């Protein structure tokens, strides 16, 4: 099976400009290719991982990746399939975000070894050197307005209003391909299927300006089996930055993937062989309640993104919380595992009587209910049941001098911080 056949078998090929010519290029020699990442935030997220890992698979097959950080295009904003104009970021912000994204990409691509080691480029380096007049003369003249308006990615915005700034975005992305081809012999661009219009602007410019053929391959935008856009947890993006989405939260995200999606996601997001995945699928279908596919997904992706130690910690947090063994975890581990539960910062004037604190922290709705909860054995401090109405919280209840975990019943948690 050649690399293109494997990408197809994994569900990673959505559209190509000329499949036969691309397969020929990929099987006859080394291809230099690129994927672009605009710094629209200070971190990449799971949605980016499809293109990143596809790029990694091609590198493992001997091809040479260029990771393009859009320091210039990030200042403009991509209008593709967006309902409204993006807010423009300052140059300083985009520069800072670009640096963070560079660091994240180095965890997935090999920038050190071999003749196909990855190269990092920033389109600000060439766009900052081009005058507006030169850009219009040397690039703009190759694009008709009719061609630009025909792109599905901007049609909707043409009706509701689009600035010239965003309208010109596709020409900038097209010029990226031309520049990389001219300087580094890059002949293939990879990106999400929503980028098709911008990406083919590059092949158009290559054809008209340099009389060369470029290839485009898009990866699918991933949705779950209900059609919901993938990569969100409770409406929030699942970030690759551990400070924005902890390894534990990422682990839980994968653990909660629906059965109908789990095997498909193993093909897309892991480097397990297709034979290994087929074996996992057989075992998974025989005992879905054991969630083998989800557990494998969680292990593989968290290890890939954050490392083996982070995976082991996420697994340990999961197991200890499930067993109610709060005291077996550090304050930092508890902050990861209980990041979504109510948090109350204890004030110096607060009563440390347990009944009072249950009401103050919003754990019980009233003192009467709080007393009943304590007497009925429904209240746990750091995993230990407390039934003393006169119990006073003390330093002994602080884990690492930072927090106390109170549980009401089986599932209602609150964290007291000091």
From Swiss-Prot:
A motif ('KMSKS' region) lies at residues 229-233. One of its GO terms (biological process) is tyrosyl-tRNA aminoacylation. Keywords: Aminoacyl-tRNA synthetase, ATP-binding, Cytoplasm, Ligase, Nucleotide-binding, Protein biosynthesis, RNA-binding. Its EC number is 6.1.1.1. It is an enzyme of class 6 (ligase). PROSITE patterns: AA_TRNA_LIGASE_I, S4. A motif ('HIGH' region) lies at residues 39-48. It is found in: Cytoplasm. It catalyses: tRNA(Tyr) + L-tyrosine + ATP = L-tyrosyl-tRNA(Tyr) + AMP + diphosphate + H(+). GO terms for cellular component: cytosol. Catalyzes the attachment of tyrosine to tRNA(Tyr) in a two-step reaction: tyrosine is first activated by ATP to form Tyr-AMP and then transferred to the acceptor end of tRNA(Tyr). PANTHER family: TYROSINE--TRNA LIGASE, MITOCHONDRIAL, TYROSYL-TRNA SYNTHETASE. This is Tyrosine--tRNA ligase. It comes from Streptococcus pyogenes serotype M6 (strain ATCC BAA-946 / MGAS10394). The gene is tyrS.
